[in-house]
Amino acid sequence: MNILFINGSPNKNGNTASLASQLLEGHDYKTLNLTDHVIGSFGQNLEQDELDFVISQLEQADMIVVGSPVYWHNICGSVRNVLDRFYGKVKEGSLKGKTLYFIFQGAAPEKWMLEAGEYTMRRFASLYGMEYGGMITNTKEAQEFTKEL
């Protein structure tokens, strides 16, 4: 199984990456750190834009884990930017058959913050034909989900 972890955190080895390693323990997976790639905002035309590379990595994966710290009560900007850029660029259903998991962690997020982030990721999965596997917010949940993978 080809597993891709998309790390939206600017800290490549921080809490988001740590939860991913706990979730994916015992599995081979590839990490794509969004901070390593130039991805312009929706409507920008940057010559060095790497969104097509990110999309190609998603298309090659069987399972996708998107990780984001909670910033300003929601998903971080780098993940939001990628989701925004999918609009019009990627056909609905083009990621059909893939499973999407969402790592969403922060220093003490309130329930409504987690619900808002999860709503976004559920809609993203649904729009592009993916099965939504669930949201992981802490070590205990990562260990529970690991058993299902």
Q: What are these model-derived regions, one by one?
A:
Residues 96-135:
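Short, glycine-/small-residue-rich phosphate/pyrophosphate-handling segment
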Residues 1-92, 122, 126-149:
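N-terminal beta1-alpha1-beta2 submodule of the flavodoxin-like/Rossmannoid cofactor-binding fold
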